[in-house]
Amino acid sequence: MARETSINKYRNLGIMAHIDAGKTTTTERILFYTGVSHKLGEVHEGAATMDWMEQEQERGITITSAATTCFWQGMAGQFDKHRINIIDTPGHVDFTIEVERSLRVLDGACLVLCSVGGVQPQTETVWRQANKYKVPRIAYVNKMDRTGANFLRVVKQMHDRLKANAVPLQLPVGAEDTFKGVVDLIKMKEIIWDEETNGLKFEYGDIPEEMRAQAEEYREKLVEAAAESSEELMDKYLESGTLSEEEIIAGLRQRTIANEIIPVLCGSSFKNKGVQAMLDKVIELLPSPVDVPAIQGVNPNTNETEKRESTDDAPFSALAFKIATDPFVGTLTFVRCYSGVLEAGTTVLNSVKDKKERIGRIVQMHSNSRVEIKEVHAGDIAACIGLKEVVTGETLCDVNAPIILERMEFPEPVIAVAVEPKTKADQEKMGLALAKLAQEDPSFRVHTDEETGQTIISGMGELHLEIIVDRMKREFKVEANVGAPQVAYRETIRESVEQEGKFVRQSGGRGQFGHVWLRIEPQEPGFGYEFVNQIVGGVVPKEYIPAVDKGVQEQMQNGVLAGYPVVDIKVTLYDGSYHEVDSSEMAFKLAAAEGFKLGARKAKPVLLEPMMKVEVSTPEEYMGDVIGDLNSRRGLIQGMDDELTGKVIHAQVPLANMFGYATSLRSLTQGRANYSMEFDCYNEAPNNVVEEVIKSKSK
């Protein structure tokens, strides 16, 4: 089946924003104007089409990036039919992983900003991620009808805070409750949208006299920005002082795709003004799949780098960027097809796992309603039903042309809590539910703590884990109690000792006799456990030696200070004795355990606590508060770097003092800082911590 839309008329578009910038309403309007959605869903009524999970409707924040396909021919029908695949991305800091996933598969993005709040904390985070993936973008300043709306202030903030080369393509006509339209600086006309038809109709008019001087000033900046795209245009501009509309668009397009400028538009999505013109600019200025560099990957057989061009003739390759569980069809695997054609019913290779998978049905999504399709072409986004083993970030490709497209990197979880089902009957259901949720979301992990036996879930923040527990209840009908997080302490020793260990039971009948001498010594941190046998002359028969090793290792699981595992020690068995009849493996195991326990008590035992490597990115004005807070958490500041939007602080902080950090950092910096945390090493805990830990263990 031939493709319906040629690939140069595709736009894979991400809508990025901070919470409350009006992103979901903007997406709704796009669906309305492109003819997909006939009733406008408002977020504050909890009915938006893109927000398809119940918790999102309650909280009014977008959690899952839903992928939607729509078509656009221009506000005045001036274009050929273009296909726009929209990926809606969440704006909450705990969901940055979702944003990373969607940015990875986009060709271009539209950043939605609030005309009152301007560049907000999460905007900076999302901006950094878009820079990382070099995503060309335009900006849309929304909510121009709100009290305090100020378009040019937001443009200045983009320059100052995001270091963006922002180029306004429009100016607002009026603001707050008098906002009625925009001045198009390319056409030098006013655009007024018709309220009767919810903005489906519009008229061009002359620029209001009082705005003419300002419009001419900004038009000149715009033409200059376009002229800088090539020497040819610059020469023409210098000679004639202006450029044609076509030349301006061509120059702006080239520089937008090269990430040299950010064209800025404005409007009020809620009042049905501005989204239509923004869609026109998505078509005119943002890249199609063939305008961005061909994706590169590694051939797993040769380890050579290979390219995949965005054509239907190339071997099939696609990236799985999201897994979702649908109550009716099971697992949906969202894929971005980079090259070739994928047909329903064919077998493909998961090159990361080197496993073949059969593609069952393929669907395209409009929010959460589905249209079944027979094949997916290069440049398209769709969801496959029935893939068993694929997880987010893996590559699907032609069986005869294996390639691993760039692997997505997922941040380590930063917060962990223990969960237990409210009833015994829910135990198995909880395990299945958590496994499904972990498959959908690589930033969420589940493991069983061997020491406490608890199920520990970890994720990107408190809200992230709240929503996981919430989804277990709603989707899998499992109620869980959530405990306080546990820290995995360890113990070791600081001195060498020699210790006798004896186990004797000799009161009638067959007795038990085991007798050992152990030398117990500390090792370098991270060296682990070492057992040395120095028995000579058979004073301990060799068949009992493994039992001695086993007895020591079992006792090491239960340290003498607070019952935590003992690490980094060397144990040497150098002497002992045995009884011809009464000795046994069990007796020597128990003798060794006793000897180790007594010896460890004399060898200056210490408690070790996990230390985390913490990096905080913060605007400079909050740096003092952030450092003060890290110091109060027994943190050791190890250095600082400059970055575009502020400072990066490097510190080492005990894990026990990092709980609740996401929340307190958010309130310290009004949410403008973000942080990453990973395990660094174990360090000796100070006395006050040791006392607290021993006290809490003995309760």
UniProtKB/Swiss-Prot annotation:
Query: Where does this one sit in the cell?
Result: Cytoplasm
Cellular component, GO annotation: cytoplasm
This protein's UniProt keywords = Cytoplasm, Elongation factor, GTP-binding, Nucleotide-binding, Protein biosynthesis
Its transmembrane ranges are none
Q: Where is the tr-type G domain?
A: 8-290
Classification via PROSITE patterns: G_TR_1, G_TR_2
Mind telling me what this protein is named? Elongation factor G
Question: What is the taxonomic lineage of the source species?
Answer: Bacteria, Pseudomonadati, Pseudomonadota, Gammaproteobacteria, Cardiobacteriales
